[in-house]
Curated annotation (Swiss-Prot):
The gene is rrp5. The lineage of its organism: Eukaryota, Fungi, Dikarya, Ascomycota, Taphrinomycotina. The modification Phosphoserine is found at S1394, S1684, S1686. Signal peptide: none annotated. Residues 72-83 have a biased composition (Basic residues). This is rRNA biogenesis protein rrp5. HAT repeats lie at residues 1420-1452, 1526-1558, 1596-1628. It comes from the Eukaryota. Residues 109-209, 226-289, 306-376, 398-473, 490-559, 579-648, 666-739, 761-830, 866-942, 973-1044, 1053-1122, 1147-1216, 1236-1307 form the S1 motif domain. The modification Phosphothreonine is found at T1391. SUPFAM superfamilies: Nucleic acid-binding proteins (SSF50249), TPR-like (SSF48452). SMART domains: HAT (SM00386), S1 (SM00316). Transmembrane segments: none annotated. It holds the Pfam family S1. Residues 1-42, 59-90, 1313-1424 are annotated as: Disordered.
Length: 1690
């Protein structure tokens, strides 16, 4: 670059002195900095830019002058012409031209910033700069979307029938992927015409694929923070979106916090902003992450459309602005994008040499590339994924602007106009100014000068340019339609026939808009030769049926019935109102109706019953598709887009409606025949009310006689007597009959209308409704039907009733019986054996009454609803009174029908206590009590002695006049009285009335937990409960503790009962009455913090609580379960309740739970919203550098209050033992410590000199154990043996009373002489073992460290070491720490093999393993104290057995969290090579969480275990643990996960199938085989099928196993191994016949001699085993025959 600048200075020697001075100084400066140090320039940026501009100007002037001089004076020489041309080219190349995007200068590979203007079915229309439009085919959006389209295409070819059923096999809707106005970066892929004709429009094909839109060969280095990048949604994850950015080995990631509810779809291509780059991941955003422009790009190729950059203005012209980026890259902005105000003087807006922000608009490839930028505000500030907000005054396309004022004229482009919309201008291209050719335009003269006004029409809108595209052409102004959106449904349009096609007629409506007249809409009748009636080029008047903007389709009609109708048009479901009459076209016809189509694809269903007044059997026989009908809307459901119409007259006047209402079924009327159809007669009954007589109802004879009657009838024939059979009020249909037998019966009032009219033993006239195999159905009036059973049809046997009795046939029958409760009646065609009168008398005798209590009652049917009578109590039960109304009439009084309100009840536990046997009581009859179903039934027929009466003695019922049987209506908040009738675990059911029950949830029963824990004892049958209605919509829900339970009704101090729904170490969530929930924090669970939550708070447990506070707006309730809060009697409080700072004073000792472990210290919750801070210096009496491992969240700590700030409510706390110890806790003083004694202590510091130990039970007395006294062997690294916080036992070596110093020793030899180990104060109840069982010799520690590296090397070189056998029952409180023996234990079958291998190991290896014999003995005998465990772990840190035993030790002490911590320590301590040892610890942790943890904690441990161990083994082990623990459902979930993640492993399928079959889920297991075959390779198919078959034999259905094996053998008949397995399975089924058949089939195959010998030998062994000697002999004979036959063949 320095060389170039020196060249420029030399070329400008002829310029003015000032310019020379500047250039020379710049050159001198550059000459001194060819190799600058640090890259800093001595010029300021502004001075540097001014110098560059001045140098460029002088160079251009000098170059121009030299060229002119050489051209005039230099003589022509050979080659001078070429030289001159080269100089002109150089001069032209130096000029920077303002780039506008035109079709001519676009090349494939050009990158452009655009906005989506239109979304079509198969492509996107993208608005480009300079009023251009390009199209992105659906195949150019992304590779992922293209692959999906390919799969859809392949699926359609394979199985077209299922394509509609599978939603995944439908073409994606681009409307779900993009929005109009959304910004995108596109790459030009092809240029051409939409069709091959000369008038074809220019077509620009674009691509949104990242590999195209991010440059030809995008590299990761080209994108920096703030760069724009086009990315494709690759997958949608829980934490964000993964993108494909088109760069190999790099991906993009959009965090969930940057999503902002944007709808993401896989395969979607979006424009994003780069936030940062980490490793191979670009962090993206959909919004601008910074308002700061990009100052520097990695390279020129990195500049892409959409990038927000700062450019330096170098030149301002009338047509635009020229600028530089980074001082070397030329960029331009044309008049479209230089200023939003067209006609504005650009020199007033831009200043030379000033840096301004701009956004890159397009990049056209070249050398150098042509780069354009935009300064328009809406381009600078856009959001990438969401469209810009439309202008509130935006005009529609097609709108005519009466006075568009010209504001700027571009002689080469056109004119810019003010259309009256702020911030949006209009632009009319020069070709759109007039229908005639415009030679030229000028801003100062002519018809299109500045400030001239014109009538203009908006023909489009350019999103990127923010311009309306205008046309001044008169032809466009006069054009009726510009777009399909301008065409209204139902509108009349004039068009010209363009062509005739098989589907119909294509009509040109306007320029570029065609419509189709379907063949069914050419005329009201079907045309065989439409070309004779319609000629191409002729004008037609049409009506618009529907429009589809997306598919660009307009449907028209030429039907005269639709063109000339004056009826209202239906083009929207919302517009359709019942009763409206309109015209429609039949689109489809079915047997039971038809689909009628109106305008805008609105459709309705026309039932066959609404097609005509006459009966129509099949609509297809009377109507044709395309037929026009006048219909009336019957009903419409706009929400579900359903409509029902009818052809029958729907509008009835009052007189006609009154006539219809007065006609009753069973009445006899007169009428006049209106018309006849093929099989019916329509009769006028007066006032335009009509009825229908079907053919079979014309007479009592058969169909032939009925047809003769039909032939005699004529229109206007008077019918004197017709019977009304049925009346359908909803359809306004009346069915009539002319059968004389029915008419006469109706006239004599012997025609039954409802089932109560039927009397047993009475003869009735009817007609056959239907004949079936079991009897004949007889119909009477109003649809009443009775059954004649097959046995009562005739005296003779009738095998097929339908052969004798035909529909509509007249019959006479006798009533056998009537079942009113089931509304059934039975008839007989047989004659009565006795006279009818005797039969009636016999029937009446059934209702005789015997010795009634009320002597006014004569018959049982005198007991009707509302009857007040007397009854005698026979027994008083808990929930009802049993009474007698007569000797043969009984009843009951339900307890809910005794009292009017709860106040009348003397003893709620025994409400019926005042009633005694023999009491005579006044009762009122309510109905019938169905004792079988325990239901209340109203009285709808005569009461018989067999029925049980439902009675009432409630005063309000006895005094009710007039009596009404209306059920009481319950509403929310009502006070009611309920009587217990049933008790379940979740609720108590109470009776409110004999027929209405209510439900009281268990939490709404009482606030006494004891009562709820023994429901049956306190809520027994019949108990009265005062309740309040909570919900009465679907079922009645009640509450016995208050009227309306809600957050507003809760008050602090209220005592409730809650049901535990979730519990963890921080607290518990409880369900409260009234569907509320509350939280009990850890400090509010107990008055003693030592009690674990699990002792009281387990899921579904009931707990008494007290309300502490209620946050009504946020629906939060704080609760307390402390006994001091929930119980009235005083209780012992160990940890007092602290409610405010006022409850504390400095020096108070209190306990709390750690809520945060921060870098500054601990934060401890000690009360309600009270958190105390513990500084690091207040944690321990001595300094401990790594203090965090000593604390964890929810840990219980004890401390002393050292500071209180009442104003800020801040509390300071100290955990130092010296500040919180009571005098009673200090058991030793300095004087009590004697030389030679053994003491327990805690390591407080480890240094090079030794270990500092704080002695337990003292006032912070610390002793020193010198490094020489740590172990009997030399210890090189003390920190490997001890760390701060370790519990140790030390021997006192020396005591210096003056200096208060104590010398201690930790050597194991100091403890050898002790025959009895003293116990610490806190371990008095723990039985200690003798010295040879409890302590591992400390001398072993040093020796093992010395040989550790040697042993590791030997182990690695020798291969696998002997495996330790896992303990089978390391238990704590009955808890098995191992995974036990399950179907997933892969090593179970190899135990004996491994033992054999151990015996064969070389002696060298065995001698090496002998080194660990002592350690094994120690591990087998588990230590008893934490100190013992810590000592042994020093010598055996890799022993999983010891670590698990340590966990069990803590669990025995109910220290659940400590057990977890030990497990975590074990995982971090055990050497990474000891994979089996680590796996054992993981299994122990999983066992722990399964037994004591939650599902969330189990899931967390499981995920960690999968990350560090073989995931498949962890899955199998966990499933085995869950199965053994009885958690089958959870095991099923994890098995399904295992199957999903390891579906290529055959054993996983077998394990899951085994589990399902063992747990009675055979149907689910049967589907696994087919699924496994789809996932496993073909080489595994035979094996997996065989194993599934074996499973069926062992655990499932043996028959299914046989079927599977038979399928295998049909494919592999000579696979002896398959035959062998099948025979083995059948041998276990104990059916010798099946086994023998299998052997016979096997030997019938062409087997080799060796295979046949094997088969005979196996068969013979089987016969001997089952003890069948004859069978064995037969096998031998068969073998001899087989051998002889084989020899003869050979």
């Amino acid at each position: 670059m320095a060389g170039n600048k020196r060249k420029r200075s030399n070329a400008s020697e002829g310029s003015d002195s000032q310019g020379n001075e500047r250039i020379s100084s710049l050159s001198a400066n550059e000459a001194t900095q060819d190799f600058p140090r640090g890259g800093a320039s001595s010029l300021t940026p502004l001075e540097y830019k001014e110098a560059v501009l001045e140098a460029k100007k002088d160079f251009m002037e000098s170059a121009s002058g030299t060229a002119e001089l050489s051209k005039k004076t230099r003589p022509k020489k050979k080659g001078s012409k070429k030289s001159s041309k080269s100089e002109l080219d150089n001069e032209e190349n130096l000029k920077v031209h303002i780039q506008s995007l035109r079709y001519k200068n676009i090349t494939p590979g050009s990158l452009i910033l655009g906005q989506i203007a239109q979304i079509n079915t198969l492509d996107l229309a993208v608005s480009l700069p300079n009023c251009l439009t390009g199209y992105v085919p659906i195949t150019n959006i992304s590779d992922k979307l293209s692959d999906r389209l390919d799969s859809i295409d392949n699926h359609a070819e394979d199985n077209a029938a299922t394509e509609e059923e599978d939603g995944l096999n439908q073409i994606p809707d681009l409307m779900d992927l993009y929005k109009v106005g959304q910004w995108v970066r596109v790459s030009v892929t092809a240029l051409g015409s939409e069709n091959t004709t000369k008038t074809g429009k220019r077509h620009i094909e674009l691509s949104l694929k990242p590999q195209d839109a991010n440059g030809s060969a995008p590299e990761a280095a080209d994108f920096v923070a703030g760069s724009m990048i086009q990315a494709v949604v690759s997958s949608i994850e829980d934490h964000g979106i993964v993108f494909d950015i088109g760069i190999n080995n790099y991906t993009g990631f959009l965090s969930k916090k940057h999503i902002n509810d944007f709808p993401f779809v896989e395969g979607q291509s979006l424009l994003c902003s780069v936030i940062s780059k980490e490793d191979r991941i670009f962090h993206l955003s959909l919004t601008a992450t910074s308002t700061k422009a990009l100052e520097v790009m990695p390279s020129v190729q990195a500049i892409l459309p959409g990038d927000y950059i700062n450019v330096l203005v170098t030149d301002i012209k009338e047509s635009g602005v020229i600028a530089k980026y980074m001082g070397v890259v030329d960029v331009t902005s044309d008049i479209y994008h230089s200023s939003p105000v067209k006609g504005e003087d650009l020199e007033d807006k831009f200043q030379l040499a000033k840096s301004v922000p701009a956004r890159v608009l397009f990049v056209i490839p070249g050398d150098p590339p042509k780069i354009a930028v935009s300064f328009l505000p809406h381009v600078l500030t856009f959001n990438f994924a969401t469209p810009n907000t439309p202008h509130p005054d935006q005009l529609d396309i097609g709108f005519i602007v009466n006075a568009a004022k010209v504001t700027y004229v571009s002689s080469s482009l056109g004119v810019f106009c003010d259309v009256g919309v702020p911030e949006i201008s209009g632009f009319a291209h020069i070709s759109r100014l007039s229908d005639k050719k415009v030679a030229g335009i000028s801003p100062n003269s002519g018809p299109y000068k500045v400030d001239s006004t014109h009538e203009a029409r908006i023909i489009n809108y350019s999103y990127v340019d923010n311009l309306y595209i205008l046309s001044f052409q008169q032809s466009v102004l006069n054009q009726q339609f510009l777009r399909i959106e301008d065409i209204e449904v139902g509108q009349f349009v004039d068009g010209t026939i363009a062509k005739l096609i098989p589907q119909g007629i294509v009509v040109t409506i306007s320029e570029g808009i065609n419509g189709l007249v379907p063949s069914t809409h050419m005329a009201d009748i079907a045309l065989q030769f439409p070309e004779r009636r319609f000629k191409v080029g002729s004008s037609v008047k049409c009506r618009v049926l529907s429009t589809n903007v997306l598919r660009k389709r307009v449907l028209l009609t030429l039907k005269k019935s639709l063109l000339n109708t004056d009826l209202p048009l239906i083009y929207d479901y919302e517009q359709a109102t019942p009763g409206t009459q309109t015209v429609g076209t039949l689109a489809r016809i079915f047997e039971d109706g038809a689909i009628v189509e109106f305008y805008n694809s609105v459709r309705a269903f026309l039932p066959v019953s609404e097609m005509s007044e006459a009966y129509i059997r099949d609509a297809r026989e009377h109507f044709k598709v395309g037929q026009t009908l006048s219909v009336t809307i019957v009903s419409c459901d706009p929400e579900n887009r359903k409509m029902r119409v009818g052809c029958r007259e729907q509008s009835w006047d009052a007189k006609r409606l009154e006539r219809f209402e007065n006609i009753k079924a069973g009445s006899v009327l007169s009428g006049i025949v209106l018309q006849k159809t093929e099989d019916s007669v329509i009769v006028d009954l007066g006032d335009k009310v009509t009825g229908v007589i079907t053919l079979g109802q014309l007479c009592d004879g058969d169909l032939n006689k009925c047809s003769k009657v039909m032939n005699k009838l004529r229109a206007s024939t008077k019918l004197a007597e017709v019977l009304v059979l049925r009346k359908d009020t909803s359809k306004k249909l009346i069915s009539l009959s002319l059968k004389k037998s029915l008419v006469e019966a109706a006239k004599e009032n012997r025609m039954p209308i409802n089932i109560t009219d039927l009397k047993e033993g009475i003869k009735y006239f009817g007609f056959v409704r239907n004949a079936t195999t079991f009897g004949v159905f007889v119909e009477f009036c109003d649809g009443l039907v009775a059954l004649v059973p097959k046995a009562y049809i005739s005296e003779e046997y009738v095998p097929v009733p339908s052969a004798v009795y035909k529909p509509q046939q007249s019959v006479t029958c006798v009533c056998l019986s009537v079942e009113l409760s089931q509304e059934k009646a039975f008839m007989s065609f047989k004659p009565l054996a006795q006279k009818q009168e005797k039969a009636v008398e016999f029937m009446e005798s059934k209702y005789d009454i015997d010795n009634p209590v009320d002597e006014t009652i004569k018959k049982t049917y005198d007991y009707v609803a509302g009857k007040i009578t007397w009854a005698v109590v026979t027994s008083a039960k808990a929930s009802q009174l049993n009474v007698d109304l007569a000797a043969n009439v009984h009843g009951r009084v339900d307890v809910s029908e005794v009292f009017d309100n709860f106040g009348e009840i003397v003893d709620p536990n025994k409400p019926l206590k005042r009633f005694h046997k023999g009491d005579k009581i006044r009762v009122r009859v309510l109905g019938i009590h169905d004792s079988r179903n325990h239901k209340f039934l109203p009285i709808s027929h005569r009461v018989s002695p067999k029925q049980f009466l439902e009675l009432s003695v409630r005063p309000s019922i006895l005094n009710m006049e007039p009596f009404s049987m209306k059920e009481p209506q319950f509403k929310k908040g009502d006070e009611v009285t309920g009587f217990v009738n049933n008790v379940s675990k979740e609720c108590v059911w109470v009776s409110l009335t004999p027929s209405v029950n209510g439900r009281i949830p268990i939490l709404d029963l009482t606030t006494d937990v004891k009562e709820l824990n023994s429901l049956q004892k306190h809520f027994f049958l019949g108990k009265a409960i005062k309740c309040y209605v909570v919900n009465a919509e679907d079922s009645i829900t009640l509450s016995a503790i208050g009227p309306l339970q809600g957050f507003e009704n809760l008050t602090p101090g209220s005592r409730l009962v809650g049901k535990v729904t979730n519990v963890n170490e921080a607290g518990a969530i409880l369900q409260l009455p009234g569907h509320m929930s509350g939280r009990v924090s850890r400090i509010d669970m107990f008055d003693d913090y030592d009690i674990l939550p699990e002792t009281k708070f387990t899921r579904n447990n009931l707990v008494g609580v007290c309300v502490l506070s209620v946050d009504v707006p946020n629906r939060k309730v704080a609760l307390s379960a402390r006994n001091s809060r929930t119980q009235s009697q005083p209780v012992e409080i160990k940890d007092k309740e602290i409610n405010s700072v006022d409850d504390l004073k400095i020096g108070d000792i209190c306990r709390g739970f750690v809520c945060n472990v921060a870098n500054q210290g601990l934060f401890v919750t000690i009360g309600h919203n009270l958190i105390a801070r513990v500084k690091i210096g207040e944690l321990f009496d001595t300094f401990i550098k790594d203090w965090k491992p000593h604390f964890h969240v929810n840990q219980l700590v004890k401390g002393s209050i050292v500071g209180i700030d009442n104003d800020s409510k801040r509390i300071e706390m100290s955990l130092k033992q010296s500040k919180i110890k009571d005098s009673s806790e200090i058991t030793k003083t300095f004087a009590d410590i004697a030389v030679g004694s053994n003491l327990d202590g805690t390591v407080v510091k480890v240094g090079d000199y030794g270990v500092l130990i704080r002695i337990d039970g003292t006032d912070n007395i610390v002793g020193l154990c010198h490094k020489s006294e740590i172990a009997d062997a030399v210890v090189l690294n003390i920190s490997k043996l001890y760390s701060s916080g370790d519990k140790v036992r030390a021997h006192v070596l020396d005591v210096d009373s003056e200096k208060r110093r104590i010398a201690l020793g930790l050597k194991s030899s100091y403890f050898d002489s002790d025959s009895d180990i003293s116990m610490s104060d806190n371990e008095e109840d723990v039985e200690m073992r003798s010295e040879d069982q409890s302590d591992t010799s400390e001398s072993e520690v040093g020796s093992k460290d010395d040989v550790q590296s040697e042993e590791v090397e030997n182990l690695e070189s020798a291969g696998d070491e002997d495996e330790e056998e896992e303990p089978s029952a390391l238990q704590a409180n009955g808890f098995d720490w191992t995974d036990g023996s399950t179907v997933f234990d892969k090593l179970a079958d190899d135990t004996e093999d491994s033992e054999d291998e151990e015996d064969e190991e070389p002696k060298r290896k065995k001698s090496k393993s002998d080194r660990f014999d002592d350690e094994e003995k120690d591990l087998d005998e588990i230590p008893s104290t934490a100190a013992d465990f810590e000592r042994q772990l020093l010598s055996s840190p890799n022993s999983s057995l010891l670590w698990i035993s340590y966990m069990a030790y803590h669990l025995n002490l109910n220290e659940l969290q400590e057990a977890r911590e030990v497990g975590k320590r074990a995982l971090s301590t055990i050497n990474y090579r000891e994979e089996d040892e680590k796996l054992n610890v993981w299994m122990a942790l999983l066992n722990l969480e399964v037994a004591y943890g939650t599902e969330d904690s189990l899931k967390e441990v499981f995920k960690e275990a999968c990350a560090y161990c073989d995931a498949l083994i962890v899955y199998e082990k966990l499933c085995g643990i869950l199965i053994k623990g009885g958690k089958v459902d959870l095991a099923d979930e994890y098995m399904q996960l295992m199957l999903k993640n390891f579906k290529q492993v055959p054993s996983v399928w077998i394990q899951y199938a085994t589990f399902l079959l063992n747990n009675d889920k055979a149907e689910k297991a049967h589907g696994l085989l087919e699924r496994s075959l789809q996932s496993l390779p073909k080489s595994e198919h035979v094996g997996i099928i065989e194993k599934f078959a074996i499973l069926e034999f062992k655990n499932g259905d043996p028959e299914r196993g046989r079927t599977i094996f038979e399928g295998l053998l049909s494919s592999y008949p000579k696979r002896l191994d398959l035959w062998n397995v099948l025979i083995d399975m059948e041998m276990k089924q104990d059916d010798p016949s099946i086994v023998r058949r299998l052997f016979q089939r096997l030997l019938a195959l062409n087997l080799s001699t060796k295979k046949a010998k094997f088969a005979f030998k196996k068969w013979l062994a089987y016969e001997k085993n089952i003890g069948d000697d004859e069978g064995a002999e037969q096998v031998k004979r068969r073998a001899i025959e087989y051998v002889s036959e084989s020899h003869s063949e050979n």
